[in-house]
Amino acid sequence: MSEQKKETPSYRIKHIGIRTDSPEEARQLAVILSALLDLGEVNETPIACWAGSLFEVMNSDARGQRGHVALQTEDVEAAMAHMQAKGVEFDEKSIRRDETGRICFVYLKLELAGFQFHLTT
């Protein structure tokens, strides 16, 4: 019997999370990014200011020394299996599940250049 080669999951950057030191700095940076890239009005939440859907400018203690990168994939569980085969570990406490019980969000236990990474659908 021949083994079928598993297809490599596809990824795309869903958004970039950028850490700042204060809500004021977060808002200022989100306004600049939004104006520069014509991303529309800044959307403020209790922990971040969003410049469109591309930049989540965090105003509180957030993961990663500099922030995080959200990687979107069609099947988070398949992507996890693919990465686990390469030795990547995941923060089990960060797992979120969809209405069917499948994992739809998880942080990697990996920080590169000050950025943490998470998978999402």
PLM-predicted stretches and their roles:
Residues 21, 26, 65, 79-81, ...:
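Residues in flexible loops and secondary-structure boundaries
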Residues 2-9, 35-42, 53-59, 84-121:
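Vicinal oxygen chelate
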Residues 22, 73-75, 110-112:
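Non-catalytic surface loops within mature trypsin-like serine protease
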Residues 1-28, 64-71:
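N-terminal beta-strand motif that seeds the catalytic metal site of vicinal oxygen chelate
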Residues 65-95:
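Mid-chain, well-packed structural core segment of small domains
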Residues 23-37, 79-87:
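Amphipathic alpha-helical segments
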Residues 46-48, 67, 102-106:
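Short beta-strand micro-motifs in enzyme catalytic cores
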